[in-house]
Amino acid sequence: MGEQTTISDSKGLFHKEFPYVIPPVYRKVLDEYLVELNLLSNQSNFKIDTIFSYGLIISFERFTVGYEPDSHISKILESLCNSCNIDIKAIKEYSNNIKKLINEKGIKEIINILTAEIKKSVGGIALSNQSGKDKYYSRLHAIGIYELISNINEDKKEGDDKEIISECVEALGFSKDRVEKDINQYKNSMEKIKEMMELIKLTVEETKRKAKLN
């Protein structure tokens, strides 16, 4: 991944590459992405893979809904990745690949493909031998799994979401408890984002209404 950088270094690089004011409502979540990516980039056995990339791209899109100007969104992600020595080009390519799989394959076939792809990305070492023993796993893997299952066509799922997630987690060698915890946290965060956006919308509408009265 290149030379190691501290979180402070990454923050400095990020703000140098993205020298714009970030609205307070988005600042915390972007800081969390920066910390996560920085920590992962400093792990010698961390390798970018498809499910991680998909989790990063999709969650970032969801957490930046309503960001203005929207033309800044892609630049923010690019700057976050660059500041942490993460290859944004590879991230986008992997994410696009999984989107194609979702449209073309059944869930079991996708799981088989992802299992082979992820194991290959860590030098052929079975992830089940590493689960809970290193920093390879990221909550973005859990998000990638959750979004994969959520977005695949119902007729290609071959089971309910909970069973499929469990099967996928086991095949990839991750800790079921850890993935379940991260998925629940993600779902809760998404609900808070939804409520926040509704509040912002109502506030904007009320401001416009008062402006018209004046």
Swiss-Prot record:
Pfam families: ThylakoidFormat. One of its GO terms (biological process) is photosystem II assembly. Residues 175-212 form a coiled coil. Keywords: Coiled coil. May be involved in photosynthetic membrane biogenesis. Belongs to the THF1 family. This is Protein Thf1. The gene is thf1.
